[in-house]
Structures are given as C-alpha cells and as structure tokens.
Regions:
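N-terminal hydrophobic/helix-forming segments and targeting peptides
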Residues: 1-198
Length: 198
C-alpha cells in the first residue's frame, strides 16, 4: 500500500469565552504568531453552520504602557468584535464556546498567475492527491495507491497517524504546503522561492 496523504484542516481559532459586552475571547488552533492576528477579519461559525464576520481587536496603542507597545500581544488580550453589545446578543446569533473561527480571506487570481488566498497548506496538497489518482486511474500498478485526506495536522498530525495505523502502508507520501522563504531570507539562504517549486 502506498498512502498518498494531504490534510484538509487549516489553522484557525476557537471561541473560549463570550464576555458580558459580547466581545469574544478565543484560543488558537495550530501555529500562530500573535503579532499577525490583530485587525484581521474572521468568520465565526454558529451553531446552525452559518458564519458571522468579526474583526480581531486589541488594546489601542495610546492606551498601552511602553512595555506593552514593545512586546507581542498575549492571545488573552485579543478579542473578536462581531458587532453586538451583549453576551445574550452573541448567543442569540448562535455563537457558543467551542465554535470554530477561521480567517476571512477571498481567493484572488492575479494577472501574473499568482493566486492569493488562505489554507493553501494544504488544500493544494489535496488537489495534488486527486490529480495523481486521476493520472494513474486504470494503470496496472504493482502497488495499491490509497488517497487520504487527513485532518488535525495543524494540531499534531493526528489524522495521518490514524490513517497510517489503519492502512499500515509500506510507503507514505505526504503532499504538504510549505512557505516560500524568499520574502525574508537572503538570496544565498533561500530554499523555497515563489513560482520555482522545490
């Protein structure tokens, strides 16, 4: 068995608490740098499966002490404003502790062939698994390829472990997204450059 694995989950957040004034406290799911979170729009999933747009807020700089301005914000000091003024209003909209939250981002195709969006790690891997399976359909192979769309990769590779323990593959090939480092590394240290593959 050759397992072709890609994960379907993405980094995000989860409702931790709804304050009396309706602001939502949250925790991270997957790897986040807290300096990248404030001022982003997010989508809060409600109990009926619809989404409410919110924006991540933090203490304004003119209210911060000098030490607060010189350090990354703690996740506990960030909140999501969904445009309500009470906990009851938030609950009436279907917001509950434990509800998932994802970044709000539009998929955009640029004129130069660049695609902008979210969760390419690892939706592109999922697309690659499908492409490989389509390409080998009907071929006589000496191995049994099995496509796997795993979950919970962003929180510890859990889905891939379950799949591997279930399928017991001889070989596993993981289709995984990786960040391009040409935006922050010097030319002699770049390993993954946008548009050049690996």
């Amino acid at each position: 068995v050759v397992m072709l694995d890609a994960h379907t989950d993405e980094v995000g957040f989860m409702v931790r608490l709804i304050r009396p004034n309706g602001l939502i406290e949250f925790t991270t799911i997957g790897g986040w740098v807290t300096t990248n979170i404030p001022a982003h729009q997010v989508l809060v999933r409600t109990i009926d499966g619809t989404y409410i747009t919110g924006i991540v807020g933090s203490k304004p700089p003119h209210y911060m002490s000098e030490s607060e301005r010189n350090q990354a914000p703690a996740i506990e000091n960030l909140y999501i404003d969904i445009g309500v003024s009470s906990q009851q209003e938030a609950c009436d909209l279907g917001v509950r502790v434990g509800n998932p939250i994802v970044p709000k981002a539009e998929l955009e195709f640029k004129n130069n062939g660049i695609i902008c969006g979210k969760a390419f790690d690892d939706r592109l891997g999922c697309a690659a698994v499908v492409e490989v399976l389509e390409a080998i359909r009907g071929e006589s192979l000496s191995v049994n390829p099995v496509g796997v769309f795993s979950s919970q990769e962003e929180v510890g590779l859990r889905g891939a472990q379950v799949a591997a323990n279930t399928l017991k593959p001889d070989v596993a090939i993981c289709f995984e997204g990786t960040p391009a480092d040409d935006t922050f590394e010097s030319c002699d240290r770049q390993q993954t450059v946008l548009g050049k593959g690996l």
